[in-house]
Structures are given as structure tokens and as C-alpha cells.
């Protein structure tokens, strides 16, 4: 191709590249604009309700002052139970997929089912637990039922993370440990888990960040409670459900609490996400 013919082609490619880059930047700015708008609205309305009463008083009746102490407690209990239930099962299932089911048909089936569960709407999981547990206990809503529905959200995230992280561990580490006569289970626990710990912990934190804002499954399981309750087999308040109730009410005091709860929840999710990224970054730096 002569220089005269190559020049227009080069110019056209440059123009296409500049246009594509410009469109990408505009799209990114468009998304950041609305994200900033949402965060600004959340901060401007939520800060008005941030005070000591928010964390020390219970949800109030209409047109009275109060806080979200019982809702914060309920969310902490249900999220903690969900992590406690979903994490061990997810780690064990992910370990089986990575170490034993990698080249088996059963492993392919489990991965397929896990992917379906990973993308399932949370309200479907809530209805499943409602049918499986709540209806079988005489329609008794409870924090435990809410934790079960959240555990079904945690489970596929931890399974996928554990599977991926263990498969990233170099096979030479497995072979070196096995060549020393170490049993397979010790290789998994003492070698593989240590190498993949940062990634697995990151997955658990991301699962926690996801379930902390879930509302739909709790509407069918934990329901809610206006009072302080520490019995996990009774209805219990949670921040997302209270926000859903208060935000749609005509009472200004409830709306202020809903905005404040949304701000606290957003900050919590942000801190958890930053912690997860910090763990991954520190692990990457230590390996480099």
C-alpha cells in the first residue's frame, strides 16, 4: 500500500478512535453525574437525622421523635447469622468444586446451579424461605427466617469466590505439599486456604455488603418489629424494611429517619467495600 493510500486510512482510524474515546468519556461522566446527584441528595437529606437518638432510641410512633436502634440491632443480628450460615457452606462447596469437582459432570452441574442462584432475584429467595420455613411454623415470622433468606444470597457469592481463588493457587504448591506425604485435607487447610485467604475474605465482605441493604426477602420472613427484640425466633426490625415503611409514609419525622438510615447504610456498605479492596490490594503488594 502506497503512502498516498495509507494516509486517508490512518486519518479515518484516528477520527474513529477520538470519537470512540469521547463517547466513552461522556458516558462515564453521565453516570458519575447521576451517582453524584444521588449521593448529594442522600447526604443533604440524611445528615438532618444523624444524631445520638438515631442510634439509642427505638422506632417511634407517627409524629413522635425516635431512632433506629432496634432496626440497627436487627440488621446486625440477621446479617451476622446469614454470614455464619452461608460462609462455611460456601467455602466447603467452593473447595469441593475447585479441588474435587473441577473435571466432573457433577461439578459442572453445581456451578450451573450456583450461577442461577447467584442471579436469582432476592424476592424469589424470600418467597422460597417463606414457603419452606415460615409457613411450616404456622406463619411465624422471625429473624432466623430472615437470616436464612439472606444466607441464600451469601452462599453463591462465597461459593464462586472460593472456587475462583483456590483455582488461582499454583498447582506446584499442591504438588510440592503432596510430595512430602501431607494428606489432602491438610494441604487444603494449611496451604491452599492460606494462599487464597485474602480473596475468600474479600468475597465474604462483598456478600455482607450486598445483603445489608436487602429489603424484599425480609418482608416475607423477618417482617418487622417496632420494639426491641433479641429473640431470633420472633419478628425483628431491620434497617431496609424500616426505611421502606418510613419513606412512603406522610409523616415528616419518619421520612427524616428513613433518609438517615439510608445514609448510615450507604456509609456502611462503602466502608465494607473499601475494606475488601484494601485486603486485595495489600495481598497483591505483599506478593509483589
Where are these regions (language model features)?
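Periplasmic/extracellular loop-to-transmembrane helix junction in inner-membrane transport proteins
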Residues: 3-26, 40-84, 103, 245-256
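C-terminal transmembrane helix and the adjacent membrane-cytosol boundary/short C-terminal tail
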Residues: 20, 97, 101, 163-167, ...
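Interhelical loop and adjacent transmembrane-helix boundary motif
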Residues: 59-66, 218-266
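Transmembrane-helix boundary motif in ABC transporter permease subunits
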Residues: 82-114, 127, 135, 276-285
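Transmembrane alpha-helices
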Residues: 83, 161-162, 182-220
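Amphipathic cytosolic juxtamembrane alpha-helices at the membrane-cytosol interface
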Residues: 89, 102-107, 111, 170, ...
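Generic hydrophobic transmembrane alpha-helix motif, especially the helices
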Residues: 115-152
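Non-cytoplasmic
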Residues: 132, 136, 143-144, 150, ...
Amino acid at each position: 500500500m502506497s503512502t498516498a493510500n495509507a494516509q486517508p486510512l490512518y486519518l479515518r482510524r484516528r477520527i474513529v478512535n477520538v470519537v470512540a474515546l469521547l463517547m466513552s468519556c461522556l458516558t462515564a461522566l453521565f453516570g458519575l453525574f447521576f451517582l453524584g446527584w444521588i449521593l448529594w441528595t442522600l447526604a443533604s437529606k440524611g445528615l438532618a437525622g444523624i444524631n445520638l437518638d438515631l442510634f439509642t432510641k427505638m422506632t417511634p410512633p407517627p409524629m413522635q421523635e425516635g431512632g433506629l436502634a432496634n432496626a440497627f440491632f436487627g440488621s446486625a443480628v440477621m446479617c451476622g447469622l446469614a454470614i455464619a450460615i452461608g460462609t462455611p457452606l460456601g467455602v466447603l462447596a467452593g473447595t469441593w468444586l475447585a479441588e474435587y469437582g473441577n473435571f466432573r459432570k457433577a461439578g459442572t452441574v453445581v456451578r450451573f446451579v450456583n450461577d442461577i442462584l447467584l442471579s436469582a432475584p432476592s424476592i424469589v429467595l424470600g418467597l422460597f424461605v417463606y414457603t419452606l420455613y415460615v409457613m411450616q411454623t404456622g406463619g411465624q415470622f422471625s429473624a432466623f427466617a430472615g437470616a436464612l433468606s439472606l444466607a441464600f444470597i451469601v452462599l453463591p457469592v462465597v461459593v464462586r469466590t472460593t472456587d475462583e481463588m483456590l483455582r488461582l493457587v499454583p498447582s506446584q504448591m499442591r504438588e510440592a505439599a503432596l510430595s512430602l506425604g501431607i494428606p489432602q485435607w491438610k494441604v487444603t487447610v494449611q496451604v491452599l486456604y492460606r494462599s487464597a485467604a485474602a480473596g475468600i475474605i474479600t468475597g465474604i465482605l462483598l456478600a455482607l455488603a450486598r445483603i445489608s441493604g436487602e429489603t424484599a426477602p425480609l418482608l416475607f420472613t423477618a417482617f418487622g418489629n417496632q420494639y426491641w427484640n433479641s429473640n431470633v425466633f420472633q419478628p425483628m426490625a431491620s434497617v431496609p424494611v424500616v426505611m421502606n415503611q418510613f419513606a412512603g409514609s406522610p409523616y415528616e419525622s419518619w421520612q427524616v429517619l428513613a433518609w438517615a438510615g439510608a445514609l448510615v447504610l450507604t456509609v456502611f456498605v462503602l466502608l465494607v467495600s473499601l475494606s475488601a479492596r484494601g485486603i486485595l490490594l495489600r495481598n497483591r503488594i505483599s506478593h509483589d
